[in-house]
Amino acid sequence: MEEEDEEARALLAGGPDEADRGAPAAPGALPALCDPSRLAHRLLVLLLMCFLGFGSYFCYDNPAALQTQVKRDMQVNTTKFMLLYAWYSWPNVVLCFFGGFLIDRVFGIRWGTIIFSCFVCIGQVVFALGGIFNAFWLMEFGRFVFGIGGESLAVAQNTYAVSWFKGKELNLVFGLQLSMARIGSTVNMNLMGWLYSKIEALLGSAGHTTLGITLMIGGITCILSLICALALAYLDQRAERILHKEQGKTGEVIKLTDVKDFSLPLWLIFIICVCYYVAVFPFIGLGKVFFTEKFGFSSQAASAINSVVYVISAPMSPVFGLLVDKTGKNIIWVLCAVAATLVSHMMLAFTMWNPWIAMCLLGLSYSLLACALWPMVAFVVPEHQLGTAYGFMQSIQNLGLAIISIIAGMILDSRGYLFLEVFFIACVSLSLLSVVLLYLVNRAQGGNLNYSARQREEIKFSHTE
């Protein structure tokens, strides 16, 4: 205890205000990197936060990066292959409601993050063992366990961000976290196929053992994320002791009875969300073989094209977030994003144009939609219902992804890629119709969702007077 008190006194003696004014630090004061009230220390924490979710996002799309190898080595059709994505989504139909509750009331942010990181690690290891032992059911079970940790770990990551950066660069932090997530997905898409070929050359043959070893090596990223979770827990506990700050909480209040009070605009936002994302993530999950078969690309080139959505999303998400913040007009931006996605899918389905064009357009529209759609929930729901609204939105998104992943696999097995693309076009068209309906309903109700940034500022100012 005496050492802890000395550390706290040393840090407080050389506080950030003195350092910012250029005053000399008190004797015995620790370096800025060790002081939880200083920017340098917060940047260290930010680095750990970004890598906290890296393993989860890297391994989520392992099946997409190894689609050909998984189907060949495990001798499964596309329908069974897509179950690897469906099993990830099923637990999150329920857990989206309770992830925040578990972090706030049961585990706490530190233990919650460690536990969810362990689920991610164990799930990936079981997934890899399924390949090594040629047991596809074990791979499915591994993806289920992986899913239990994956989405809840993202909630924990956001909770840490708010705890450390609220009022201090928070929007930038969220943008950087999203960018790191997309980098993880991109690295996976371009690395795993190459890694498989190297292990195949080393072992002298392809097969389920080669697949399992490749997935096990990919799981090292999950161990890296677990190490970050442990380091964050230590630093957060240390900061709480030194600065007497409270442990971070999600602030979510989930009341399922609030669902009956949801307005028509909110239900339309839910429909837009589900119909849009089911035409993006399952497509990426199946995209590699599509680019190989239709356009004649090599496996490596097909992986690069398939990952371009994430490549573009990494730098553009913060840019589009700033753009929407500065301009407002959320519905118009959502309309542009959904329309551009529809054009992208139509180009891929009905033309032989270079798919880089369509995929770059899809990457831009995907980034724009996330920045414009999700904040709209806060404009149509009272603050005390936000946790329920976002939980419900994520829940039905995961339900949609689970069901559509299976349907997409069945369509591809029975009808081929053209029919699958027509199916995705139908989903995006339904999303576009919902955006138009949202615009009309919102206009009839006063138009608050489509206010400009200036109008929102004026209304906010008038309410404070």
Swiss-Prot record:
It comes from the Eukaryota. One of its GO terms (cellular component) is lysosomal membrane. InterPro entries: MFS (IPR011701), MFS_dom (IPR020846), MFS_trans_sf (IPR036259), MFSD1 (IPR052187). One of its GO terms (biological process) is protein localization to lysosome. The gene is MFSD1. The chain crosses the membrane at residues 39-59, 83-103, 113-133, 135-155, 170-191, 213-233, 266-286, 303-323, 331-351, 361-381, 392-412, 418-438. This is Lysosomal dipeptide transporter MFSD1. Coiled coil: none annotated. Belongs to the major facilitator superfamily. Residues 1-23 are annotated as: Disordered. Keywords: Lysosome, Membrane, Transmembrane, Transmembrane helix, Transport.
